[in-house]
C-alpha cells in the first residue's frame, strides 16, 4: 500500500475512534418519552464520571464532593468523599447549578468578573457561584448535563479529567485571568 493511502486510512480511522456518539451517554428512548427530554445524561454515565473524578482525587491526595445534574437541574448522581465539610458539598452543587444557568464553566465566569467590580455586584445578586470546579458536560456539541466538584484546589482539573476519560473530548478549559491587586484606582 502506498504511504499516502496508509496515512489517509490512519486519519479516517483515528477520526472515527475519537468521535463521540451521544446515544451512548444519554437516557434511553423509553425514558426520554417519559421526561420529554432526549439529550439528558444517563445515570450510568453520571456514575462513571463521578467514579473517574474520585479516582483522580484519590490519586492526587484530594477529597472532593461531586454533583452531576441533568440539563433541567435534577440531581443524577452525587458523591461526597470522606473528610468533606458541608461547605465543600454545597459548593459542588452550586457550581453544577451555575453551569446550567450560564451554559459555561464556572471558571470562565470567574474570569469575566475578576477585575470588574460592577459585574461582581451584579453577579452577587444571581444564583451563581463563579469559581473553578463547574463544567458543562458536552457530547456531540450538546450539553447533556453539568458537573460540579468542590473540596480542593484542583476541582476543575478533577472534573475535566473525569469528563474526558468517560465521554471524550471537551471544550478547552478557561485560562487563568490575573486578578488586579487591591488598592486605589489610578
Model-based region annotation:
Residues 10-19:
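Hydrophobic h-region of N-terminal signal peptides that target proteins for export
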Residues 20-186:
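Flexible, solvent-exposed loop/hinge segments and secondary-structure transition points
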Residues 2-10:
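Sec-dependent signal peptide recognition
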